[in-house]
């Protein structure tokens, strides 16, 4: 099965030379779905593109006028040629995925009576020096891993015997080398361009608004839930301590999730014995904070007491939810077949 296209070629991409604060990522997520129809299956293709944790493009083949649409103000400045190109690539990807779905139905000996999905994620991570940290080309079929490009950007991992058919095809076409060239060149150039055009949004750091909520479970136990709201970027660390000792195993931690307004939210909870709430503190780390926050639940009259950066020996917490992980949660990896940016991709 052929890899999917990735990200949209732009003419005149800027090769910026400045140093960037932290690492950044460019991701193209897509989902193709086949559904039973009266005479033949119906198909839908949706693609979204992200810089770090910000969606800026979207395409839906079921729209009244299928076209690539802006989802961030800073990309609206692009000219007609950009939109013509990106729409053209998305439509080509949709056609390619439709063919890929049909081939996979045959290879897996499946019926057209059911619904099937083909998902994918492609993109690159850039370090503070502007160089490639890692490239991605991953696919899944019906919610299960299918094939992915390894970290060496030279070899593939196939999930089963059907995926190995695709792997052999990729190897014969030297597709990994072709894609690696794209990642090391154009993908990074696109990312630099987007970061420059959208720097007021993409390179900002909004600190979290944090508080601790108290939820009695019984006369003997209560849940303390530490909330972090309204932060950007998505990377954040929430931990609970009891008398200064981290409660990693006893902490319920949800994945960072979008708030719907361009920021993110997250919570971490612990179950504590009633009457011992003051022994527990929540610790919040985020790049938008001048120093870590420490919060404690006191009483109904003063539910939350934030203490900013207080203990001299407080260890720096290193659990970071990266943009890539957030992205992985948001999509479930897909497989596909398509032409990439400035060149054509092999078919299945």
From Swiss-Prot:
GO biological process entries: antigen processing and presentation of endogenous peptide antigen via MHC class I via ER pathway, TAP-independent; antigen processing and presentation of endogenous peptide antigen via MHC class Ib; immune response; positive regulation of T cell mediated cytotoxicity
Cell division listed as a keyword: no
Transmembrane segments: 308-331
Positions of the UniProt region annotated as Alpha-1: 22-113
CDD domains given in the database record: IgC1_MHC_Ia_HLA-F
Signal sequence range: 1-21
UniProt cross-references to PROSITE patterns, sorted A to Z: IG_LIKE, IG_MHC
Region feature Alpha-2, mapped onto this chain: 114-205
Region (Alpha-3): 206-297
Keyword Oxidoreductase tagged: no
CC per GO annotation: external side of plasma membrane; extracellular space; MHC class I protein complex
Protein localization: Membrane
Family stated for the protein in its record: Belongs to the MHC class I family.
Function noted in UniProt: Involved in the presentation of foreign antigens to the immune system.
Complexes and interactors: Heterodimer of an alpha chain and a beta chain (beta-2-microglobulin).
Protein's recorded name: Mamu class I histocompatibility antigen, alpha chain F
UniProt organism field: Macaca mulatta
Source taxonomy: Eukaryota, Metazoa, Chordata, Craniata, Vertebrata
Name of encoding gene: Mamu-F
